[in-house]
C-alpha cells in the first residue's frame, strides 16, 4: 500500500514539513513519486519512520539515526527490544521522581519529615558517574593519556539523561549477548550484537577501530575489574565476548563472499 505525505502525517503525528525535511536529508525517502512529483510512502517507509521516532525519543541525533538505520548490521527486532528496555528504565526513573515529588508534597503539607536519602530518589548520579569512570579507565588503559583526555572531554558534555540512555543501551547489549551464549560466539545474532556494541562505543565514547576493538576484547579478560563487571551479566561472558569480538573483526577485515 502507498501513502501520500498528508496521510503519513495524519497516521504518525509527524508534520508534513518534518517529513519533507527527513526526505531532504535522506533520512526517510519516499519509496516512489507520482507522475506529478508527489511523495508516496510504503509500509516499509512507515516502519523506518517508527524507528526514527523511537531513536529520537531516547536521545539520538538525526545524523546518528540515519547512520544506524543504514548500517548493514541493523536489526529491527533487536533495536525494538533495546528501545523498549531503555524506555522502561526511563519510565522507572520518572515513576521514582513522581513518587519523590508526592512524598515531598506530603512533607511540605505537614506530614512526616522525609529521610534525607528519600529526598533524592530517582535523582542519584552515582551509577552514571561510576559508568563514566569505567569508560575513562578503559580508554586510558588501551590508548594512553592523550586519547583518554579527548574521550573524557567528549563524554563530559553529556547530560544526566544522556548518560542514563547510554547506560541503558550498554546494559541492553550485554544482556542481549549473554542471552545467546549457548549459540556460540559466531552466531549471527551474537555477531550483530557485537557490531552494535562497537557502534555504541564509536557513537558515545571514541573511534573504535578494529585494532582497538580487538584490544578491548583482550582487556576484558586480562583486567579483573572489567572481567568481574562483564561476568555479572553471565558466567564466562567476558571470555565469550572476547571470542565474539575476534570473530567479528576477522569478518570485517576479510568479508565473506
From Swiss-Prot:
It comes from Bacillus subtilis (strain 168). Residues 5-24 bind DNA. This is HTH-type transcriptional activator mta. One of its GO terms (cellular component) is cytoplasm. InterPro entries: DNA-bd_dom_put_sf, MerR-type_HTH_dom, MerR_fam, TipA-like_antibiotic-bd, TipAS_dom. The gene is mta. PANTHER family: HTH-TYPE TRANSCRIPTIONAL ACTIVATOR MTA (PTHR30204:SF90), REDOX-CYCLING DRUG-SENSING TRANSCRIPTIONAL ACTIVATOR SOXR (PTHR30204). It comes from the Bacteria. Residues 76-107 form a coiled coil. GO terms for molecular function: DNA binding; DNA-binding transcription factor activity. One of its GO terms (biological process) is regulation of DNA-templated transcription. PROSITE patterns: HTH_MERR_2. The central dimerization domain of the first subunit forms a two-helix antiparallel coiled coil with the dimerization domain of the second subunit. Global transcriptional regulator that activates transcription of bmr and blt by binding directly to their promoter. Also stimulates the expression of the mta gene itself, ydfK and ymfE. Residues 76-104 are annotated as: Essential for dimerization. The keyword Protein biosynthesis does not apply. Residues 2-71 form the HTH merR-type domain. The lineage of its organism: Bacteria, Bacillati, Bacillota, Bacilli, Bacillales.
